[in-house]
């Protein structure tokens, strides 16, 4: 037999447009980087953005709604399969990421030959420097393994391109 909920909603704290939430975060303050050395030696961090007007990490959540014979619905969230598309990567001579991508294309490499690390830096979240007298900036960041997979190569008269997918795997490790 259905029941009626007669409870009142009280003491609601509304946040959002009217709240004093601080300065809007500028897009360039969320930095996306790849290790262009693909785990071979010291990381060579390449920052996305030179030829991109937009980059998003699609979270691809694994969710399901289940309804039982009593008419109740449950929600199951099993995780994420994050990925991103860098669909306008123009090749620049001497660029270590271009050289790594061209190597993958030339060798039709797969699997761990395409594995590297991704770094996301929250440049709006500057931390106090631990070392006095230095001018270094310290920001919150996360590092995660990923696979970089070229989706095509070629392009038009505007330049040689190697667009690619980034498939993030494993857990993010938070640090500064």
Language-model features: where?
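Context-gated lysine
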Residues: 28, 67, 109, 115, ...
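Broad gene-expression machinery/nucleic-acid interaction feature
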Residues: 83-85, 116-118, 161-163
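Solvent-exposed edge beta-strands and adjacent loop segments
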Residues: 2-93, 143-158
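Short, cysteine-centered beta-strand-loop-beta hairpins and adjacent loop/turn segments enriched
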Residues: 91-98, 172-175
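Short beta-strand and beta-hairpin "edge-sheet" elements
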Residues: 50, 122-174
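Short N-terminal helix-initiation segments at or just after the protein's N-terminus
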Residues: 15-33, 98-111, 164-168
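Short, acidic/charged, Gly/Pro-enriched secondary-structure junctions
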Residues: 98-140
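A broad "ordered helical/assembly scaffold" signature
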Residues: 58, 66-70, 102-108, 118, ...
């Amino acid at each position: 037999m259905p029941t009626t909920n007669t409870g009142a909603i009280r003491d609601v704290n509304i946040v959002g447009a009217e709240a004093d939430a601080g300065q809007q975060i500028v897009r360039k303050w969320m930095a996306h980087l790849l290790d262009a050395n693909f785990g071979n030696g010291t990381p060579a961090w390449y920052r996305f953005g030179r030829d991109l007007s937009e980059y998003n990490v699609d979270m691809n959540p694994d969710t399901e709604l289940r309804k039982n014979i009593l008419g109740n619905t449950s929600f199951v969230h099993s995780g994420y399969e994050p990925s991103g598309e860098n669909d306008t990567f123009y090749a620049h001579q001497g660029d270590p990421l271009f050289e790594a991508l061209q190597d993958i294309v030339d060798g039709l490499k797969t699997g761990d030959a395409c594995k590297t690390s991704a770094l996301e830096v929250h440049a709006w979240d500057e931390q106090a420097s631990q070392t006095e007298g230095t001018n270094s900036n310290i920001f919150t960041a996360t590092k995660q393994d990923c696979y970089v997979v070229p989706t095509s190569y070629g392009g038009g008269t505007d330049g040689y391109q190697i667009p690619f997918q980034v498939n993030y795997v494993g857990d993010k490790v938070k640090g500064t």
